[in-house]
Amino acid sequence: MKIITLLIIVVVVFSALGLWLVAYGNATSEERNMNYGISMSTDKMNYSVGEPIIMTLKILNYTKEDIVFHFNTAQRYDFIIEDEEGNEVWRWSQDMMFAMVLGEVTLGSNSPEVTYTAEYKDKFSPGYYKITGILVAKDRPMSGNVIIILK
């Protein structure tokens, strides 16, 4: 009985969230502190099964000062897609190898943002999915997520 009640609550929450997101053209999430932030979005919120999903992760500098992000490898970002139960169904970096070199990205007044994109083309079953975009900086890791609907 508890499992059924919990399942009903999850469905209601995801349905309400989906209805709220439908009012907006695409799915967007933004997280920030006083100096910098992250914006995660998709090209739209509702997809047909098999339709490509375009994901965009933006890192923004809200100041006129340089902000430096340091990395342990050549990887700068990642995208993860999870189903309604929280199971990871896709990770952008899954089958990739990154050079083991230290690196940095500097956001300043001349270049206050950097954008990373990825496209997912395989098929999922219809339902709600959470997409998380991650900046993998060792000193300032950040993430943002959005919910999409596959019909």
Where in the sequence are the language-model features?
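Secretory targeting signatures
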Residues: 1-28
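Intrinsic-disorder/low-complexity peptide segments enriched for small residues
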Residues: 4-5, 17-19, 38, 133, ...
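Generic detector of bulky aromatic hydrophobic side chains
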Residues: 9-11, 56, 120, 134, ...
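Contiguous segments within soluble domain cores/interaction surfaces
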Residues: 25-40, 45-118, 128, 132-137
